[in-house]
């Protein structure tokens, strides 16, 4: 293992910055140390890695299988089109990809709307604005621990449906042929029903499983369910349970999707932001859900 490896907690209930390591040349002992730190902190930040796409994919695969989005192991999350131009920045002119980018500025966990939710993600920055565009992470383990007894008892009794179609509909996104968005998650006919409390399969810690895709709690009417879930997210995603990362080109982060929520922050949409995302596949036996 690299003897210069340093892990520095962020000061929030989650997250640590890792230095003294290059992910492209990480040996098995080094990865074992990082994996243990990942389970402890749930978010690891690696400044200045400057990984190629192939190097990012190789690193991501050390965690297990990759959830293939649009048929690939890595996908651009960007307001820059394939021809190099920046997507329309005016809300009236947003294409579906911009609507997904803006939708992801609400707190969420990845792929909860799929039959098997993701276990995590490797995310890197290629082009970032000087101001804005941070990614924020919220610790749902600590949020669960801080619940009052009545709310804790209630969330243990409840589940919610998760749907990208539902969450994106709030931005007027209706997937159609020729869309700028690849359609991942928008063509799912069966809706996963997930308990509001998820027990981490490796650490055993319970956490809240909520976010923008969650809705329609059985046993509550639509308005009551929405009020309850929105209030729970607003309460949960507060200091000291939140860390915001200001990106620099070359940074890499790895987060545990099984116990964190995340969201992007706005930036001047006239400026380019190019990020690369490799989603770590969950296991059906622990991240699967009943479909309704």
Swiss-Prot record:
Xref: Gene3D superfamilies: Clavaminate synthase-like (3.60.130.10)
Catalytic activity annotation: (S)-2-(4-chloro-2-methylphenoxy)propanoate + 2-oxoglutarate + O2 = 2-methyl-4-chlorophenol + pyruvate + succinate + CO2; (S)-(2,4-dichlorophenoxy)propanoate + 2-oxoglutarate + O2 = 2,4-dichlorophenol + pyruvate + succinate + CO2
This protein's pathway: Xenobiotic degradation; 2-(2,4-dichlorophenoxy)propanoate degradation
Cofactors (names): Fe cation; L-ascorbate
Residues reported to bind 2-oxoglutarate: 135, 247, 273
Binding of Fe cation, residues: 108, 110, 262
InterPro entries: TauD-like_sf, TauD/TfdA-like, TfdA_dioxygenase
Thermal activity characteristics from the UniProt entry: Optimum temperature is 25 degrees Celsius.
A Pfam family hit: TauD
Induction summary: Repressed during growth on high concentrations of 2,4-dichlorophenoxypropionic acid (2,4-DCPP).
Annotated EC: 1.14.11.43
Modulation of this protein's activity: Inhibited by divalent cations, most significantly by copper and nickel, and by diethylpyrocarbonate (DEPC).
pH dependence: Optimum pH is about 6.
One term of GO molecular function: dioxygenase activity
Keyword terms, alphabetized: Dioxygenase, Iron, Metal-binding, Oxidoreductase, Plasmid, Vitamin C
Subunit (UniProt): Monomer.
Family: Belongs to the TfdA dioxygenase family.
Function: Involved in the degradation of the phenoxypropionate herbicides. It can also accept (RS)-2-(4-chlorophenoxy)propionate, (RS)-2-(m-chlorophenoxy)propionate and phenoxyacetate derivatives such as 2,4-dichlorophenoxyacetate (2,4-D), however it can only accept 2-oxoglutarate as oxygen acceptor.
Protein name as it appears in the record: (S)-phenoxypropionate/alpha-ketoglutarate-dioxygenase
Organism in which the protein naturally occurs: Delftia acidovorans (Pseudomonas acidovorans)
Taxonomic path: Bacteria, Pseudomonadati, Pseudomonadota, Betaproteobacteria, Burkholderiales
């Amino acid at each position: 293992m690299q003897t210069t490896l340093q892990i520095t907690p962020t000061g929030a209930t989650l997250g640590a910055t890792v230095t003294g390591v290059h992910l492209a040349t990480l040996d098995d002992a080094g990865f074992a140390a990082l994996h243990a730190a990942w389970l402890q902190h749930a978010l690891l930040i690696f400044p200045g890695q400057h990984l190629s796409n192939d190097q990012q994919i190789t690193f991501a695969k050390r965690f297990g299988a990759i959830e293939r989005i649009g048929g690939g192991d890595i996908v651009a999350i960007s307001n820059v089109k394939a021809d190099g131009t920046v997507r329309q920045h005016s809300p009236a002119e947003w294409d579906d990809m911009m609507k997904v980018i803006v939708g992801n500025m609400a707190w969420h966990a990845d792929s909860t709307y799929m039959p098997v939710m993701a276990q995590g993600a490797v995310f890197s920055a290629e082009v970032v604005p000087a101001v804005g565009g941070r990614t924020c992470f919220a610790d749902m383990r600590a949020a669960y621990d801080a619940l009052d007894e009545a709310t804790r008892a209630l969330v243990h009794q409840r589940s919610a449906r998760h749907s990208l179609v539902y969450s994106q509909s709030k931005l007027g996104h209706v997937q159609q042929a020729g869309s700028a968005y690849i359609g991942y998650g928008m063509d799912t006919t069966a809706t996963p029903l997930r308990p509001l409390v998820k027990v981490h399969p490796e650490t055993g810690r319970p956490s809240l499983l909520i976010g923008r895709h969650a809705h329609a709690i059985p046993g509550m009417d639509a308005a009551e369910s929405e009020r309850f879930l929105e209030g729970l997210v607003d309460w949960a995603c507060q200091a000291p349970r939140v860390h915001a990362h200001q990106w620099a080109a070359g940074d890499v982060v790895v987060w545990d999707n099984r116990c964190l929520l995340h969201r992007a922050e706005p930036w001047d949409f006239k400026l380019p932001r190019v990020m690369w995302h490799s989603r770590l596949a969950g296991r059906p036996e622990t991240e699967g859900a009943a479909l309704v």
